[in-house]
Amino acid sequence: LYESDPTDEVIAMGADVIVSVNASPYNKGKIKLRCDMVAHRAKLQKKPIVFVNLVGGNDGIIFDGASLIADEEGDIILQAAAFEEFVETVELDVRKPDARGITGGEIAAIHQALVLGIRDYAAKNGFKKAVLGLSGGIDSTLVAALACEAMGPENLLCVMMPSPFSSEGSIKDSEELVRNLGCESRIEPISATFEVLLNQMNLHKPTKGGESLAA
């Protein structure tokens, strides 16, 4: 599947089917790119290619699975579901309609990748619960929603930490979010701690950049 591809060598040795066992990590657009590459190579070599890919999260790397088979005409005759284990029996000599694109859209794939990555990171590192800060903004809201989906709302504690820079709306938004998600929450104000930090560092109360210092 690359410039230094070994398919010529195995075909010269008499191979009827090429099986490519991979740990190909996910990134945006990778599933379609992989399909196109496998289909092109199968048609070029006039041999079926079975592309078997690892699925699961490993620290910061996510493997999407999405294994596939291209026949000698370059048609994708099997496209496994992405981000989940998949077992299938396939007859290579039976013509089937092209299955390309069965894994769904790119936004859905990114969503599945994030959920799988969080779930496997927690499981493989031996923890079942998580604590995260909730500001009421878009970033922490998205993280909380993904964590609830990956680990279950009963395993998530959201901590709201109002500071001198927090608005009343951000707290209300955070409280509404945890009600909708069904997870546990706590409010731990940090205004007093922030003042202590300013005094210890002999800083005047900042204007610009104060939010970052509070964080």
Where are the predicted features?
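Conserved G/P- and acidic residue-centered "switch" motifs that form tight phosphate/ATP-binding loops
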Residues: 137
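Conserved acidic
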Residues: 102-110, 166, 209-210, 214
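Generic "edge-of-domain/loop-turn" microfeature
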Residues: 97, 165-166
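Alpha-helix boundary/capping detector
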Residues: 140, 148, 203-204
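A conserved beta-strand->alpha-helix junction
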Residues: 84-91, 155-160, 166-212
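Enzyme catalytic cores with a strong preference for nitrogen-chemistry domains
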Residues: 1-133, 144-149, 153, 160
